[in-house]
């Protein structure tokens, strides 16, 4: 029997730091994203700092390398990112709390502004039931369109 729902943020709550830059750097190292994407991301970040209301444009620029990539392929990349790179950033206290709440019958939901391209793999690495995150659009062909948060 469900005893309620608990909501958690991801970046700086369940894991140390912001996750989008480590994901981009992982994709560059694995040759999924070109190195020039880092320059594009830096420019997008500066633009976002100057105009915070344009966060979706900054994310679109940062993640534009996804355009045309298969959602299934990127799910495999997301799994590898968490497994190979990001698990050490998970806060042990946060994981302990998740397990405690789960044992009490709570449903656990992570709500994050981070993109779903990698956040959708998170339930495989944490005891959570769902993730609500920034949507990266996938077309009818199962490939990313390059649109983020639209």
Predicted regions and their residues:
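Acidic/polar active-site rim loop that often engages polyanionic ligands
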Residues: 20, 58-59, 141-146
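Glycine-/proline-rich flexible loop or hinge segments
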Residues: 43-44, 56-60, 77-82
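Helix-loop "lid/cap" segments that line or gate small-molecule binding pockets
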Residues: 45-50, 57-67
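Acidic catalytic patch
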Residues: 67-77
